[in-house]
Amino acid sequence: MTIQDLKKSENFFLLAGPCVIEGEDMAMRIAERVVKMTDKLDIPYVFKGSYRKANRSRLDSFTGIGDEKALKVLKKVRDTFGVPVVTDIHGPEEAEMAAEYVDVLQIPAFLCRQTDLLVAAAKTGKIVNIKKGQFLSPGAMRFAADKVVEAGNSQVMLTERGTTFGYQDLLVDYRGIPEMQTFGHPVVLDVTHSLQQPNQTSGVTGGMPALIETVAKAGVAVGVDGLFMETHEDPTVAKSDGANMLKLDLLEDLLVRLVRI
């Protein structure tokens, strides 16, 4: 798969799925439903699921069902529904392993400056989606993208996921979307993570899911190339990031409203 495949529709493309792979059955149910709604709306779709969550607030937080088991779930989604899949990697040693199962390697925001990680992802030949660090300006992301390109891989996407605003909040500066697009790579808006409220004293990240539609509409209106949204059948029992995920039952109606913009 190439980035050109994601740009085949006049609509934005969508990266969506659970924050982390919690089990095969749930992942397959979510994928099946999102595939049906995106096919109907002519939205190019990439199934999203982290095979492991390396960045959790507390040691006792859920991190995954096991690397190989979760990666095999992602491969089953791809093989069953014929859609590409994306997952995060956290160190250079993970790039080649994950690339055997997925189509897009995602670089977490906190790791977006890690040269060895970016180069390792680039060398797999997969699409590399680099999330903008909450601490970086949009302009600084040019250098992260250049690392991947200079390592021999032009298949790069950049994702806006909010900028730190005080100790426990994030804001999206929509000016950054067209600015990053000038670098020559598609730009994605991570709607749900942009609504996180991190660093809570409870050790569990908060969120403002009621604003998902507002943030998504603004991104589409600005002209973002793709949207990233984590979704779950019941966010209240999700094992990671439930506080800012979109309930799956609400996704199709939201997409209908977004494609009208």
Model region roles, listed by residue range:
Residues M1-L15, K72:
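N-terminal amphipathic alpha-helix/helix-capping segment at the start of soluble metabolic enzymes
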Residues L15, V46-K48, V86, Q106, ...:
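Conserved beta-strand positions in the central sheet of alpha/beta enzyme cores
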Residues A16-R29, S57-I65, V83-D88, I107-A109, ...:
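Active-site mouth loops of central-metabolism enzymes
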Residues V20, A109-L111, I212-V215, V222-N244:
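Glycine-rich phosphate-binding active-site loops on the catalytic face of alpha/beta enzymes
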Residues L15-A27, Y45-D67, T231-D241:
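Glycine-rich, proline-tolerant flexible connector loops at the mouths of alpha/beta enzymes
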Residues K7, G125, N129-T231:
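Catalytic alpha/beta core domains of metabolic enzymes, predominantly
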Residues E32-L41, D60-V86, A121-I127, I177-V187, ...:
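Alpha-helix-loop-beta-strand connector modules within alpha/beta enzyme cores
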Residues I65-G66, T80-E94, D103-D116, I127-P138, ...:
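Catalytic beta/alpha-barrel core
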